[in-house]
Amino acid sequence: MFSPDIWSRQVLRATEANLVIARSVNRGFEDDASVGKTVKVASIGNLAARAKAENTAITYETVAETATTITLNIWSYAAVGIEDIVKVQAIVDVQNEYQRKLGYALAKDIDTKLATDFAGFSQSVGTLGTAVSDANVLAAIKLLDDADVPQDDRYFIMSPAEKVAKLALDRWSNALYIGTGQYPTRTGMLGDMYGLNLAVTTNLVKPAGGQANNAIFHRDALALVVQRTPKTHVFYDIDFFSWKLASEVIYGHQEMRDNFGILLLGAS
């Protein structure tokens, strides 16, 4: 009866997924979204060079471009209530801890929505449930090259199972192939490969057990427009002697260039 419970100042926070997709897509349209429900992005096509014959009029091409619309119709929130007794008796700053978790909840929601866009790419390689092979990666790169996709800002978003499979490949981990200075088998970290920025996350669409929708894409394949960045509201509810915290975000996402992205069917 003389041995009280002692609470540690340290806490066990729930683990969080590595959120990597939102930072890998085009967010350049956000300045145009201060008002309104949509952002319309015009397209500009290529023109043809023609041979000029003497004493003949030149031919003018007729421009009939289409627009891609980014609809800003996603309004997400996360909320939590903290009773006064918890806040008073807790040795840690509970309110501060959960404010951080509110931000993570909204960030994960955005990344999750973007992950669903991978399945919208019309081109795919690989087989669900089987790790993406080196040949699959090269095939995806060829599809991008064939479409004249710029060489910079290319990303390979993969599941942890895909990372492990790549660490086992000499071409991805052996210094004879990747040069000195990178030691994936020692650090467990994959460096850039084939001009791709590599990122690993558990936050991918998994059609079934052991399966994952990975992707190789250029930044301009997908667009994210956050019209209202996460905004937190805090008020005291006297009826329940509780602090109420809520955070909201308004955004939209859209596939912009289908041939700039490749769905890699693989393992999870």
Regions found by a protein language model. Give the residues of each.
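N-terminal "assembly arms/tails" that initiate or stabilize quaternary assembly
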Residues: M1-T68, L72, R228, G261, ...
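Short, structured patches in soluble enzyme cores that scaffold and shape functional sites
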Residues: D84, M158-P160, V249
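Extended, compositionally biased alpha-helical segments that mediate assembly or anchoring
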Residues: V234-S268
